[in-house]
Amino acid sequence: MRHEVHVHADIPILEGVSRRQVEQALGPWLEYLDADGLSDVKSLEPDEPGLKYDEKELILYICWTGEIGRSFHPALEQALENLGPYCYEAVEVDLTEYQDNGEQEGKLLFVGPTAQAIHEAQRRCMVEDLDAILGRQFDKEQVAQVTALVNRLFDED
């Protein structure tokens, strides 16, 4: 069963990493899409760039919507794992799946140079999300208590 998915991320790449290295790292995803390189990846949405590596800014821009099947997730996850060593820092990759019944499901993936960097990015995202949600209802001191607990949980993990 196939359905639509949107992948979005701005991934900072280390200086000296070539387009070819990025394409090789993304190989499992490119192969899944039957694409020879980044420029062959087209989004279903015409205003989305797909996959673009800005060699001047050292950022891999991902803004892609496509139709996927069962083997998509392993291909994407392997590509992100391969890309990790080329990342300047760990960042989130936002994945949204659109179901046939009209519902959508969001998932955050992470890519980064080390497991520790990814762990810290996960912590940062969790704390930012909690701060935004709880800050609407509670004062800063109360939110800080929850943040301290989350930080402790991440430290123990």
Where are the regions a protein language model picked out?
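Short, extreme N-terminal segment that most often corresponds to the first beta-strand
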Residues: 1-31
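Charged interaction segments
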Residues: 25-32, 39-157
